[in-house]
Amino acid sequence: MPWLQIRLAITPDQAGALEDRLLELGAVSVTFMDAEDQPIFEPDLGTTPLWSHTHLLALFEADTDADALLAHLRLLRGGELPEHQVERIKDQDWERSWMDNFQPMRFGRRLWIVPSWHQAPEPGAVNLLLDPGLAFGTGTHPTTALCLEWLDGQELAGRSLLDFGCGSGILAIAALLLGAERAVGTDIDPQALQASRDNALRNGIDPARFPLHLPADLPRQPADVVVANILAGPLVQLAPQLASLVRPGGRLALSGILAEQAGEVRAAYEGAFVLAPTTEKDGWVRIDGVRR
């Protein structure tokens, strides 16, 4: 069955009203997708976590009048529409175009992120199976890649890890597959925790090795390794808390930081950590170090 798809480039503050209106106009589904595989940041309590650049995809039955839909949306927006695209698609094209965007990716020497519908290119490597979706972080964004490459280079055997702002769980699961004994994940969004749980099961991770918590329920036990891929502002605000969650001699890796923000973040952590030189990738950076 063919479908009419409307794609809108939106910001988080536009999401609620547009979603409600599109459903009222007959959309059979409304989906939010990350426009750039950006890291999820900590949203305000009670809000839906979205990326700063988000694509809204609304699917309608094929005989829907696209011009009438756009006219309704234009009225809702005071005569203006966000950047948009209208196309008619087949079921098979819809599925194939989505799946073809995600190919296996290698990080460091050992680690591969493999969409679950692909064969692992190196069956003997450390292969993390992942279904890209709402669950925040597929490995394609530089910040995720920086963290995965760092984890691949660490000696994790027998270590404990905390993934602060775990999203899909990709970093914690990678650490467990690379030899960590236990990982704890925390995220403000319950959907992210469920996605982390699902991804862990897909990779054969015993739930006892990967407990998940909302921030208010997070145990205050320091870990050997802490990773936090969120954004610079929250990282600066959370510096005392994150420092307290790394044991003396333990390691910390931070990302979600633009290159021009590195100085501010380093200043917030250099009192508690011996920091390595900043690592940059495509305008984003990773800051890592050892707890004093």
From Swiss-Prot:
It catalyses: L-lysyl-[protein] + 3 S-adenosyl-L-methionine = N(6),N(6),N(6)-trimethyl-L-lysyl-[protein] + 3 S-adenosyl-L-homocysteine + 3 H(+). One of its GO terms (biological process) is methylation. InterPro entries: Ribosomal_L11_MeTrfase_PrmA (IPR050078), Ribosomal_PrmA_MeTrfase (IPR004498), SAM-dependent_MTases_sf (IPR029063). Transmembrane segments: none annotated. GO terms for molecular function: protein-lysine N-methyltransferase activity. It comes from the Bacteria. Its EC number is 2.1.1.-. It is found in: Cytoplasm. S-adenosyl-L-methionine binds at residues 144, 165, 187, 229. Keywords: Cytoplasm, Methyltransferase, S-adenosyl-L-methionine, Transferase. Its main location: cytoplasm. One of its GO terms (cellular component) is cytosol. Pfam families: PrmA. HAMAP family: Methyltr_PrmA. Belongs to the methyltransferase superfamily. PrmA family. Methylates ribosomal protein L11. This is Ribosomal protein L11 methyltransferase. The lineage of its organism: Bacteria, Pseudomonadati, Pseudomonadota, Gammaproteobacteria, Pseudomonadales.
